[in-house]
Amino acid sequence: FLAGMAAGFVTGILHTFFGIPGILASILTQIGLYSVNLGIMGKSNQAVNVMQYKLVASLRYVTGEGSELFFVKLIVAALILIAIIYWFFGTELGASIRATGCNPQMASAQGINTGFTKVLALMISNGLVGLSGGIYAQYQGAADVNMGRGAIVIGLAAVIISEVIFAKFCAGRKAAFAFTLGAIFIGAIIYYIVIALVLWLKMPSDYMKLFSAVVVACF
């Protein structure tokens, strides 16, 4: 989580302090982190000894004994994370970040330091991405420098699917933001169900990226 926050801080500084466009700043950070990951791992891929370490998530927890308890813990952790995010974005600082994202010019006119809120938002989001990457590496039992490719497609798919399915349900409700956060998790689950269905139908795995794009386009 802290490593991800550091990456977000670098991206934010490149964008706000040096004036580099947001997309380019994120690409530059990603390119730099590729070499950093290689330096830390020593090679392009590294196995995680599941018997030596007590892991947060592992494939053996899903397929072995006590898998039901693991799924319960996973759901509880997701709900706690949603609650924390909802609480934070309801605070003055969180509202400032949301205002900056909606309309940075108006937020700046209201006296909000948009440079600070952008950096903070990038640090939080990248911290969550880093935490997710660490958990995913534990689950897979290995880490690879290329394993994060395509993650943006999954994230966008989760957001788009949740918006299409739950937009009318969340509109106008008092806790619409909380419902939206929960809907994103459900959207990600629906996306993976569709992908699992594609695999179950024994369609060529070489076209998995194409199937993913079609799923997002359909929604």
Label every PLM stretch briefly.
Residues 22, 26-90, 144-145, 207:
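Transmembrane helix-bundle core of multi-pass membrane transporters
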Residues 1, 7, 67-148, 152:
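Helix-loop-helix "hairpin" substructures at the membrane interface of multi-pass membrane proteins
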Residues 1-17, 41, 60, 64, ...:
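Membrane-embedded helix boundary and interhelical linker motif in transport proteins
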Residues 1-31, 36, 78-82, 186-187, ...:
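Alpha-helical transmembrane segments within multi-pass membrane transporters and channels
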Residues 12, 37-38, 81-89, 133-137, ...:
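Structural signal for membrane-spanning alpha-helices in multi-pass inner-membrane proteins
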Residues 129-210:
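Transmembrane alpha-helical segments in multi-pass inner-membrane proteins
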Residues 17-20, 116, 178, 200-202:
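Helix-loop interface residues and adjacent transmembrane-helix termini in multi-pass membrane transporters
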